[in-house]
Each structure stands twice: as structure tokens, then as C-alpha cells.
Amino acid sequence: MTRQGMRDDLRGEADSVVHDGTDDIDNENDIDNGIDNENGNGIDVVLVTGLSGAGRGTAAKVLEDLGWYVADNLPPELIAQMVDLGLAAGSRITQLAAVMDVRSRGFTGDLDWVRSELATRNIVPRVVFLEASDDILVRRYEQNRRSHPLQGNQTLAEGIAAERAMLAPVRASADLVIDTSALSVHGLRDSIERAFAAETVAHTNVTVESFGYKYGLPMDADTVMDVRFLPNPHWIDRLRPHTGQNADVRDYVLGQPGADEFLDSYHQLLNVVIDGYRREGKRYMTVAIGCTGGKHRSVAMAEALAARLAGSDALTVRVLHRDLGRE
């Protein structure tokens, strides 16, 4: 079952809740906490909660980037059903995260109920609690021009105070508390990645795309490299009909002076760039390699580069040959 299909099944008759944007932080203290998976049944469950505006939405996005199935603002009564679907799906879905907030009535009781329900399934959910100082929360709400969910006819500061008091018991029992007052989005991402580092590898998705310059540059490329410095197999009669995926063409291209040196140097350069992208929270990268027609040299070099990149456990690599078949 796809994530979207699972989400649709779970929502059923529940009303949709639109995320208001105030939980995406935009503002670094150092947090070095880790939380261990206590479940022995292969399903790991995390409940993300905390003060409105403290960064729950950002935390949810980080977990999703790390490969978790994330349900944002799922009604509490459906969280146990979400876990049941995860259990039924076997090992394909092993990490589930649910975002809970005070917009659900009787929030503290709801959280206790969810914990109790999951306990009957031999699952001990971990609770991540996000908070921030009052002045930071006020600033974030004012910047987003949103009202606090508990504000009502009160002032913004009073709404924040009411929520902080309501959630005090939840904070006290949380497995991990993150204060986002001085954290940027990247800082929060780093904190969550460190907390879950023992069980999750932060993969970067790299697409290596070959193309022909005569058809234009790929618009989605993050970096472009030109391999027209290599001799063109087009001018060799026995190679012309074939593509860079053909063994003879590949051996010809990779056997040229400078081909291996290029691949070694470019591979090292990309490792530096990818590490920088990862620190900045960028999880997707397109590397374009071009030749004249996108049939021989760029195809062979793209395949060879992708094979080198695929040796890293932190990368998910795919190859795309944009212009094959256009001639």
C-alpha cells in the first residue's frame, strides 16, 4: 500500500485539518539527546507534540524525509488504526509518526488513551515534545499573522500561557524535549537527525541524468558537466548505431585518456557537494552529464558515475537518460 493510500484509508470520515504554518520555525542551541526504540515487534511509533508554533510541522517534514510515514493532525482515535495497518503491512512500514496538537478536545486524555491503546499491541510510543519561549512564540505568530488555537477572546500571550499550562504533564512525561527558541530550520533538522541517528540513515536521493546539448540543458539540474572532451563514438561506424549502454561503446568511452581521471575527480567533488546539501537539509540532487546528442558519451559516463555513487549507503541513486531515442 502506498503512503497516500494508507492516509486515505485512515482518514475515512474524519474532517481534514489544514496546517496553519505557525509550526514551521524560521528563526542555534545544541541538543544532543537520543531516544531508543523500545518496541520488539518491528514497528516504531513516535508521537510528535508540543506548543503551537514551536515547530511540529517542521519536525514532521524532517521525519518524513528520513523515511518515516507521517500522519499530520490525524484524529487520535485513528492513530491506533494507523498502527494496525502498519502491522498488517509487515516489514514494509516500520516507522510511524503521528503529530498531535491541542486542537483535539481533551488533548491530554487523548494522548493517554493513545498510549494505552498502543500498549495493548505491545508498542511503547516515544513522545517528542517541542517548545519555545513565550517571546519567540509571539514573534512567530505575529510574523505569520495567525491566531493561537487557544486564544479565543484572549490576548495571544494568554493563549500561549494557557496551552503551556495544559501541556505541562505531557512535557513532563516526554521522551525528548526540544527547545526551538534559538533553532533555525536546519538546527531543528540536525537535532532530530541526531536523536534518531541510531535507527535512521538520512538518505540523499541523487539522479544522474545524461542529455544532449543540442536539445538544451536540463532545467532541473543542480550541477552540469560537459563530457564532449572525450572522442565521439558517433564517428566510428561500428559504434554509431549503439548507445552508451552498449558494452562496446561503454568500453570505448571509458577507455579514453582522461575518462577515469574525470570520474575520480568528479566523484570526489560530488561527495563534498552532497555533504553540504545534506547539512543544509537538501535531500534531492540532479547531476547532469552532457555530450552532443545524449546518446553515447554522456550515457556511458552517467552510468559509470552512478555506479560509483551507489557505493555509498547514504545515497539512493537512479539514472535517467533524457535524450535516448531522439535521433
Curated annotation (Swiss-Prot):
Keyword Mitochondrion in annotation: no
Stretch list, region Disordered: 1-29
UniProt xrefs under SUPFAM superfamilies: P-loop containing nucleoside triphosphate hydrolases
Amino-acid positions noted as binding GTP in the UniProt annotation, renumbered to this chain: D101, V102, R103, S104
One MF annotation (Gene Ontology) recorded for this entry: GTP binding
Highest taxon, organism lineage: Bacteria
Residues that bind ATP: G50, L51, S52, G53, A54, G55, R56, G57
Family: Belongs to the RapZ-like family.
General function of this protein: Displays ATPase and GTPase activities.
Name this protein carries in UniProt: Nucleotide-binding protein Mflv_3714
